[in-house]
Amino acid sequence: MAGRPEKCFSLIRFTLLCLKMVISSKTAPEIPTIDQAYSKISNSITVEWTTVPGATSYLLTAEDGNTIIETTVANSPGTVTGLKAATLYQITIRSISASGQSQASSPKQAKTVLAAPVLEVSSPSPDSILVSWDAVYMAIGFSVSVMRANGLGRIWKENTTNTSLTFSSLDAGTLYTIKAYAWNANGIPGDDSTRNQRTSPRAPANIQVFFDSGALKASVSWTPTEGAFNYTVVASSDSSQRSCSTTLSSCSISSLQCGTEYLISVSANNDAGSSKSCSAPTLKTVACAPGRVMIQEEPPGHLSVAWSNVELGDYYVAFVKSDDGLEVHCNTSLTQCNFLSECGFTYFISVFAYNKAGQSPLGDVFNYTTAPCCPNDISPVLVSSDRVEIAWSPVRGAELYETKAIAGYSIVECNDTAPACTLSALDCDTKYNVTVYSFSEVRGSNLSCSSHFITTAPCSPEIKNISKDAFSMINVHWRSTNEGATYTVTAQGKKGLFQCSSTGETCRMGGLPCGSMFSVTAVAETQAGKSLPSYSVPLETVPCCPAGLTAAQVTQSIINVSWTAGAVAQTYAAVLESYIGQSKCHTHQNHCLLGCITCGINYTVALKAISSTGLTADCAYQSYSSSVCCPLGVKLYRLGPNGIRIYWRASRGAANYSTDLYGSKGIFTCAPHAGLSFCDITNIPCGDVYTVMVSPVAETGLKLTFCPKKIYSVTCSGSTLGMVIYRGKRNDTASPR
């Protein structure tokens, strides 16, 4: 059962194939006939045939037994490509139309031609080209031709069965075109191969050499040669070789060695190779600079220069140039020269050898330095108590200056490259022997330099104490060891500068403002200069007295003394003094309350301003009279139907009084006549409470308000005054401020 469906399907496929063949035989185009098939290129065959009516294209097929290659073409002739060289193919063709394609035509055989040989070309000499290749399949011979690439001139052609050929008698440096192909046993040529090759150039002629002795450089020139792309110049000696390349007809070889003989050769180059080198005459360079140069100064002021002999040197010139630009020289065939020299100069010495090629290169330049000269214009720039600054003009040849200051066993030194020196840590008011030696690293110190004497400035004085005499003069005392010195004392502060001078050990100054701080210093001065200031001593002047001292009675027994603050004062002491006694207060404020004052007494008021350090200024003295004492026994009496009499008992001393009656219905005042101790007030409203105060009146007319006050009630009796009743005292008298 399983095999029956497969048999059924096979039968159906066979029936359909037969049906297709019947249909195609009825509608396909005619089968074309191949007229000829041939090969001109090793990878293709060209086919020619008779055109079939109704055919729109043709299918060419080439088969060699292993591969089948098909190509569709529009009409005859058609070419099948992609074939193998020297291979026999069977060619068929089918015509194609819209209805289908025909059966294959009768086959025709055709063989592809031989492959082109792969060429290797070179130019072994300027007039020849060597052509070589590998064997070609099915080839029995080869044909090779050579001609100029520009098509001019003759053509060289050779046939051979070998795989190489050499063409000679060619033009040097010329581009040639080489063609080659192989043929088979039937003499049919295969594909050809083409290469271009240039012959190598001939060697340059007319070589000339020019030598630059200063640059150790040789310039070589020649006549250009045909076909040369560039040129190579080589300079060879026994020990070295130098070269240069160029596309021009000249070239320079640099960095040649002195004292050397070179052989110069020039070769031309192109893509085929190089010509044989053409040699020019030998080149002798300049001699090398003399070596082992020795310089001696014997005796001083005379220089002797000697050197060793060198190869190719005919004579020598020695140059000696000083550092100021002056130059001398000597010309000799020997190996030594002598020159004059001076102190303080550096001489630069060079030796050259000469021959026909010119001057030798510059060798080592030697320098010789003579002993430096001594400074002769030494002068002090600054002289202080422990330091001396000196300066001088620079001298020739000095690289360093050594300065020594000697006083007894004390030696102070300083070294510097500058023409100046600061000698420090010296003793004050001391005479030193100062010498400046010039020094160079090569020659050392010149010990013949002369010395100078310099005295340092005086020593600083030491202030021992500062005192003040009865005339407010400041006395300053100091201690010093200087001889013949003048001393200046300076007091400096924010409020100015004050000075005094003396040749002794004390001086006086006055006029210093109060309330100031000063820094007091002393300076000694001699012909050598000024000392450093002494250590400063602070000086404080007494504080300034305040201005505007006033005294005001606060109560009958208390006085308020006030003033404006004075400069520097920290506290104040106020004293109120009379024959009875005194009252004091000490405060940091600008007012003070003094108690236990007796009324009606003359006092003296004194004020002292005291600084934070305890300095005291006695500032003010003035007299002050205390107020009249308050009256005693103040009473109110009814005086008629509408009046009140105020009565009191006067205290000691005569005084004027003023009475005041305060009520809710008004204030009533009266001033009694001098000497009276009562005062009457009329038209007083009844039915009110009154406060009564009797006040002394000062000479200035000021009414004092600190006396006690009493309270009375005044009743009404009908429309007139009734009873006057005492109610007590009021406690609102002025309190101390």
From Swiss-Prot:
It is found in: Secreted. Glycans are attached at residues 230, 433. The keyword DNA-binding does not apply. Gene3D superfamilies: Immunoglobulins. Residues 28-115, 116-203, 204-288, 289-373, 374-459, 460-544, 545-633, 631-715 form the Fibronectin type-III domain. GO terms for cellular component: extracellular region. The keyword Secreted applies. Keywords: Glycoprotein, Repeat, Secreted, Signal. Residues 1-25 form the signal peptide. InterPro entries: FN3_dom, FN3_sf, Ig-like_fold. Pfam families: fn3 (PF00041). Disulfide bonds: none annotated. It comes from the Eukaryota. This is Fibronectin type III domain-containing protein 7. It comes from Mus musculus (Mouse).
